[in-house]
Amino acid sequence: MNDKAENRKMFVVAYCKDKVGEEATQERHTHMQGHMDHVASIVDHIALAGPMYADDGETINGSMLVYKTDKIDQACEWLKGDPYYQANIWESVEIKFIKVALGDQVGGLTW
């Protein structure tokens, strides 16, 4: 393994798919400010985050958060503090590890 490969970081990704329907859309809007306040309060622990969109490029249908941790329990703790999680707007939440091989989080290329 080269020196750059040692810079690869393990992060935790949360892919959160919204429930379908007007009620879920309204819940998203109702809790948006609380969600924004929450992610702002943990911004130093987030590599990137944002809404996911349907194929039309306009309809929000979920959220993705990439946490700067290699501990799923820690990422789940941050996620459970999110008003969207607490309001149960997500139909499903998938949590996975990602080892970052390139990008500004690891100084460019790691090979």
What are these regions (language model features)?
Residues 1-111:
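Conserved, structured core segments of small domains
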